[in-house]
Amino acid sequence: MATNWGSLLQNEQQLEELARQAVDRALAEGVLLRTSQEPTSSEVVSYAPFTLFPSLVPSALLEQAYAVQMDFNLLVDAVNQNAAFLEQTLSSTIEQDDFTARLFDIHKQVLKEGIAQTVFLGLNRSDYMFQRSTDGSPALKQIEINTISASFGGLASRTPAVHRHVLSVLSKTKEAGKILSNNPSKGLALGIAKAWELYGSTNALVLLIAQEKERNIFDQRAIENELLARNIHVIRRTFEDISEKGSLDQDRRLFVDGQEIAVVYFRDGYMPRQYSLQNWEARLLLERSCAAKCPDIATQLAGTKKVQQELSRPGMLEMLLPGQPEAVARLRATFAGLYSLDMGEEGDQAIAKALAAPSRFVLKPQREGGGNNLYGEEMVQALKQLKDSEERASYILMEKTEPEPFENCLLRPGSPAQVVQCISELGIFGVYVRHEKTLVMNKHVGHLLRTKAIEHADGGVAAGVAVLDNPYPV
């Protein structure tokens, strides 16, 4: 995609002045992170990295991503309710991947005891890149779906004003008017509020499971503030706090510090290093409760790479979403090529394909949080090591998406403004709420655009690679 900011990106003096104005506006709007030096304190903060200009995104692909989000919500919820599918899909993975196995063990314990919760809440973000087709036109391809701790809905609500400001400074008022309004935090809070309401106790609270060191706290506060505006109170606690002060009564109602909890919202618990033995016990306690969990353990498992790969098999979508051929077609149109690495002929063929053309593939473990995927020579070495080992079942292989690079200027604290070749990743936030078997809410609630220099193969904003951006529809 060509950029219409080309001439602006060549004027170094103008860029420096614009960058100063943009940073000041970002700080004024609350596009903030705590510093890496003081991740537990808000005494000193910095702006979150962002692009100086919004990046061009084809309107048709933006509309397609929005149109399919409610289908993805339904699909995740269908996987959540299909214990047999989850068990069959993850059977080889849990033998080789300890983290997935621990999550699945909690899932089995909860099923055996009987699921206490009647309200189910999903706050998802489906991420896409724009694949360059052979004829040069871009196509929407899903990278992953995040079913736990899908972040930046708060900060993404604050960046449109920054880009409108930059374009207004340049007297580009018509262009400024094309920046889409975007407020994911409001929509995410609506989902939490609906789950809280259905829980049915006006004195109950929302519990946000937080990390001790949380640089991205302002993103979370945006959702907390939306809830407080509805007179719904949020308490922030760590897994360690739950171990010490969490309990269930005989009806499996959850209490923390003596206060009843209606909804548990996880902003922690998606990576192995976030769990001590004590934390695993706390997670089990939360899962056994009748509070609505966002996500519950089955929904977290539904977001694994292995489930994503299995959903791409012929017939799987039809089995999970019977009688919904239009939804199935919309979903399938976004799938990239995904391959199992389970032991056997199918896995052997996938490895042979990747070794023959490594630039076309990416090797993905069952991990969230960014920066875990393997590319190029690293992938080749890993596949050679894994080729004859059952450990390979803990990975999947995915066809690499190759977007058309474009120029933009990246702004980061402590670094000069940098004009580089970039690629973008578009995320769409989705919310659904189910009460027992009845779906009471299913909607898309906003978007997130992240952009990074092309030399970075993997990693998001939190991993220090990508920066916040806005789509400029063309």
Curated annotation (Swiss-Prot):
<dbReference type="GO" id="GO:0042803">
    <property type="term" value="F:protein homodimerization activity"/>
</dbReference>
<keyword id="KW-0547">Nucleotide-binding</keyword>
<feature type="modified residue" description="Phosphoserine">
    <location>
        <position position="415"/>
    </location>
</feature>
<comment type="function">
    <text>Catalyzes the production of glutathione from gamma-glutamylcysteine and glycine in an ATP-dependent manner. Glutathione (gamma-glutamylcysteinylglycine, GSH) is the most abundant intracellular thiol in living aerobic cells and is required for numerous processes including the protection of cells against oxidative damage, amino acid transport, the detoxification of foreign compounds, the maintenance of protein sulfhydryl groups in a reduced state and acts as a cofactor for a number of enzymes.</text>
</comment>
<feature type="binding site">
    <location>
        <position position="144"/>
    </location>
    <ligand>
        <name>Mg(2+)</name>
    </ligand>
</feature>
<feature type="binding site">
    <location>
        <position position="125"/>
    </location>
    <ligand>
        <name>substrate</name>
    </ligand>
</feature>
<dbReference type="InterPro" id="IPR005615">
    <property type="entry name" value="Glutathione_synthase"/>
</dbReference>
<feature type="binding site">
    <location>
        <position position="450"/>
    </location>
    <ligand>
        <name>substrate</name>
    </ligand>
</feature>
<feature type="binding site">
    <location>
        <begin position="364"/>
        <end position="373"/>
    </location>
    <ligand>
        <name>ATP</name>
    </ligand>
</feature>
<dbReference type="GO" id="GO:0043295">
    <property type="term" value="F:glutathione binding"/>
</dbReference>
<dbReference type="InterPro" id="IPR014709">
    <property type="entry name" value="Glutathione_synthase_C_euk"/>
</dbReference>
<dbReference type="InterPro" id="IPR014049">
    <property type="entry name" value="Glutathione_synthase_N_euk"/>
</dbReference>
<dbReference type="InterPro" id="IPR016185">
    <property type="entry name" value="PreATP-grasp_dom_sf"/>
</dbReference>
<feature type="binding site">
    <location>
        <position position="368"/>
    </location>
    <ligand>
        <name>Mg(2+)</name>
    </ligand>
</feature>
<feature type="binding site">
    <location>
        <begin position="214"/>
        <end position="216"/>
    </location>
    <ligand>
        <name>substrate</name>
    </ligand>
</feature>
<dbReference type="InterPro" id="IPR037013">
    <property type="entry name" value="GSH-S_sub-bd_sf"/>
</dbReference>
<feature type="binding site">
    <location>
        <position position="305"/>
    </location>
    <ligand>
        <name>ATP</name>
    </ligand>
</feature>
<dbReference type="InterPro" id="IPR014042">
    <property type="entry name" value="Glutathione_synthase_a-hlx"/>
</dbReference>
<feature type="binding site">
    <location>
        <position position="220"/>
    </location>
    <ligand>
        <name>substrate</name>
    </ligand>
</feature>
<dbReference type="GO" id="GO:0000287">
    <property type="term" value="F:magnesium ion binding"/>
</dbReference>
<comment type="subunit">
    <text>Homodimer.</text>
</comment>
<feature type="binding site">
    <location>
        <position position="452"/>
    </location>
    <ligand>
        <name>ATP</name>
    </ligand>
</feature>
<feature type="binding site">
    <location>
        <position position="458"/>
    </location>
    <ligand>
        <name>ATP</name>
    </ligand>
</feature>
<feature type="binding site">
    <location>
        <begin position="267"/>
        <end position="270"/>
    </location>
    <ligand>
        <name>substrate</name>
    </ligand>
</feature>
<keyword id="KW-0479">Metal-binding</keyword>
<dbReference type="GO" id="GO:0005829">
    <property type="term" value="C:cytosol"/>
</dbReference>
<comment type="pathway">
    <text>Sulfur metabolism; glutathione biosynthesis; glutathione from L-cysteine and L-glutamate: step 2/2.</text>
</comment>
<keyword id="KW-0436">Ligase</keyword>
<dbReference type="Pfam" id="PF03917">
    <property type="entry name" value="GSH_synth_ATP"/>
</dbReference>
<dbReference type="Pfam" id="PF03199">
    <property type="entry name" value="GSH_synthase"/>
</dbReference>
<feature type="modified residue" description="N-acetylalanine">
    <location>
        <position position="2"/>
    </location>
</feature>
<keyword id="KW-0317">Glutathione biosynthesis</keyword>
<dbReference type="GO" id="GO:0004363">
    <property type="term" value="F:glutathione synthase activity"/>
</dbReference>
<dbReference type="GO" id="GO:0005524">
    <property type="term" value="F:ATP binding"/>
</dbReference>
<comment type="similarity">
    <text>Belongs to the eukaryotic GSH synthase family.</text>
</comment>
<feature type="binding site">
    <location>
        <begin position="461"/>
        <end position="462"/>
    </location>
    <ligand>
        <name>substrate</name>
    </ligand>
</feature>
<protein>
    <recommendedName>
        <fullName>Glutathione synthetase</fullName>
        <ecNumber>6.3.2.3</ecNumber>
    </recommendedName>
</protein>
<feature type="binding site">
    <location>
        <position position="375"/>
    </location>
    <ligand>
        <name>ATP</name>
    </ligand>
</feature>
<keyword id="KW-0597">Phosphoprotein</keyword>
<keyword id="KW-0067">ATP-binding</keyword>
<feature type="binding site">
    <location>
        <begin position="148"/>
        <end position="151"/>
    </location>
    <ligand>
        <name>substrate</name>
    </ligand>
</feature>
<feature type="binding site">
    <location>
        <begin position="398"/>
        <end position="401"/>
    </location>
    <ligand>
        <name>ATP</name>
    </ligand>
</feature>
